[in-house]
Amino acid sequence: PTGREEAWRFTPLKRLGGMHDGTAIVADRHSLSLGGSSISGVTFELKSASEAPVLSESDDAIVGRIREYASEVAVLTIAANTEVAEPILLKRSAADLSSAEFSRVQIKIESQAQATIIIENTGDTHLAEDLEINVAPGANLTLVSLQEWDANTVHAGRQHAVVDRDATFKSIVVTIGGSLVRLLPTVEFSAPGASCELLGVYFATSGQFFEHRMFVDHKVPNAKSRVNYKGALAGDQAHTVWIGDVFIRAAADGTDTYELNRNLLLSDGARADSVPNLEIE
């Protein structure tokens, strides 16, 4: 990308550390781990890329780099009919700004299972992340993503969920740390009766850049989506971007969708860009 493309027009490319154009030094590290003790019906393992093929397509430049560089995939699986009472904690902590980690992660919740997963991101690092989520028929998943990075972190991530028949997916994104955070929480419905809720809060202070770029693909009938993001900004050159894009395809009769973004500017010199989009095929 050059910055002239619609998907990149707000992003300060020079601050991405080369993760978008192939000039980053690729780190050989896996900073994601499962916190706490083992849980019945839940497995977390590192697989080779050939053992964990991609679950979705993406035209994002950084996702393309991740899939080129990442030789292993962290896979979390929740077995069918498992109801996990306590939240599952995934922790990512790193302290290396000299190279970039290109990370592939897959979360698979099987049919009729129910769970809450918390991803806690801390430390100072450069991270490119492709997180794919598969929500099987009748499953119910809540995913909480906490960006609590230190001041110099650059984090570019995609969080893409495929939601099947009568399944429910809730995403809660909290972004308060890092120098630059660019997240793509996206959803595609693969069968009728699916629903999603994308919620987010962010607080940017002096010099921080936070971009949250939503896309919900209503490709089947009778699916429901709710998007609600709220932000606050304080300090010179604090900058946030929210893009909310809902695509209703011709076959998606009975679609129920809603999106909202609100921002509170607490000082001069801060800027919040908000762009809602609704596309009907």
Predicted features and spans:
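Long, low-complexity, mixed-charge
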Residues: 1-57, 61-67
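Conserved beta-strand/loop scaffold segments within soluble protein domains that form the structured core
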Residues: 51-281
